[in-house]
Amino acid sequence: MPATSMEELVSLCKRRGFIFQGSEIYGGLQGFWDYGPLGVELKNNIKASWWRANVYERDDMEGLDAAIIMHRLVLRHSGHEATFSDPMVDNRKTKKRYRLDHLVKDQKPDVVAQVAEGIGESVENFAAVVAALVAHPAKAAEVLVAAGVRDPFSGEVGDWTEPRPFNMMFKTSIGPVADEDSFGYLRPETAQGIFTNFKNVVDSTSRRLPFGIAQIGKAFRNEITPRNFIFRVRELEQMEIEFFCTPGTDEAWHQHWLEARLAWWEAQGIPREKIQILDVPKEDLAHYSKRTYDLMYNYPTLGYEEIEGIANRTDFDLGSHTKAQAELGIQARVEENFDSVAKLTIPHPETNKPVVPFVIEPSAGVDRAMLAVLAEAYTKETLENGSERIVLKLKPHLAPIKVAVIPLARNREEITSVAKAIKAKLQSLGLGRVLYEDSGNIGKAYRRHDEVGTPYCVTVDFETVGKGEDPALTDTVTVRDRDTLGQERVRISELANWLQARLR
């Protein structure tokens, strides 16, 4: 069965070199994580699978890698300067700060109910409770104290301030002079780089509607309370598509991308029945969204949380960044833009008249994807002899190590030389990482590779080099299957094809 607690995953990730705390030798830095030898392989494999499915295997997609630091005008006209914020409260007693919705949600049910009652909303509609607290800050401070909202740090009822917005973008100075005219932002999402490069991509590729632009890259959000391992972090990586289509076809494309993304998650080992589709209520939609589907995965300990959002952003984004807005018939409500120097239109495929396209955006976080893949693959099994093993039943294309080549005797040159030659041959096939494993104890090596998700272990033994009891086994190796524990003798000359057929 999959992992049932976050602690199991955290322990495995630290022990086996998937994920480490950022800046750990100096006490760590909250909200920042480093990916170790196996973590970087798994992360890269997830990204490669996404890129292959959405760029290489489609005829309507282009790729992009935009800059991380953005001109502040980009994020002003996108709405981020004004709206990219979370409500924050302080406890005057402990001097700790918390994101309001997280603080209330984590209280005991009776306390949450008292907060809802105090602010005049139903406890069944938590979003409305938070919205009311934000809308009435003075009353909110009184309600939090009266309801007995406790500080997670001290465990005592806090002396809470009025909620106030906290903008989550990281500012940075650009150039040698640090003043108000020289600052920019670390991008809070990868999407804006796609929108600002829309005309460049269209002009350089001669694309016509419908088509998309895909990007994988880092984004930065100064979360008030980062938590839950790599689920909510301050430095994250996104896999985003902005799919441009003719107004009026957007709803059909929205459904298309919902199905396409569900199919991709299933191919990563997360069945459709493990994902809930949340049609986000109108009152909870982002300022740019006409309709959004949130794909919700049942994370251990956390419960159902968003793993991907698929939004119909209408013509808001290109309409916000284009010049000559008044003459383009933009349907979304956008702020006036007298700063842009580009007209972000494309010929309508039927009328050939300039049109500002609608946008469908599938947006997934690499870190959350990795956490879900690990949680779903994590399995505890009781073997016939009563012992327990932990195995990561990762899809082969995601496994950090594809094959481990193990010499049965690491001090016998005739065996190790064959094992090293096999490793070199398999590595040259382009399957992914192949590991030469000479730790000594074959049983422990098998268990270790079960735990990190290696699909196959290839053992070179005395029979392989013609020093066993059965001459027929010369030039063969034992291949062990991670999931079935089955073992099969395969001729060295056939090994590459045997593995390629199972790992592709």
UniProtKB/Swiss-Prot annotation:
**UniProt keyword list:** Aminoacyl-tRNA synthetase, ATP-binding, Cytoplasm, Ligase, Nucleotide-binding, Protein biosynthesis
Q: Where does ATP bind?
A: 221-223, 231-236, 306-307, 365-368
Known role:
Catalyzes the attachment of glycine to tRNA(Gly).
Query: Lineage from the top down?
Result: Bacteria, Thermotogati, Deinococcota, Deinococci, Deinococcales
Which Pfam family, just one, is annotated for this protein? Answer: tRNA-synt_2b
The family database entries (InterPro entries) matched by this protein are listed as:
aa-tRNA-synt_IIb, aa-tRNA-synth_II, aa-tRNA-synth_II/BPL/LPL, Anticodon-bd, Anticodon-bd_dom_sf, Gly-tRNA_synthase/POLG2, Gly_tRNA_ligase_bac, GlyRS-like_core
**What is its EC class?**
ligase
Q: Which GO terms describe its cellular component?
A: cytoplasm
Q: What is this protein called?
A: Glycine--tRNA ligase
**Which cellular compartments is it found in?**
Cytoplasm
Any idea of its EC number?
6.1.1.14
Q: How does it assemble?
A: Homodimer.
Please give the family membership noted in the entry. Answer: Belongs to the class-II aminoacyl-tRNA synthetase family.
> Which residues take part in binding substrate?
99, 189, 236-240, 361-365
A Gene Ontology biological process noted in the UniProt record is: glycyl-tRNA aminoacylation
User: Which GO MF terms are attached to this record?
Assistant: ATP binding; glycine-tRNA ligase activity; protein dimerization activity
Database matches in SUPFAM superfamilies: Class II aaRS ABD-related, Class II aaRS and biotin synthetases
Which chemical reaction does it catalyze? tRNA(Gly) + glycine + ATP = glycyl-tRNA(Gly) + AMP + diphosphate
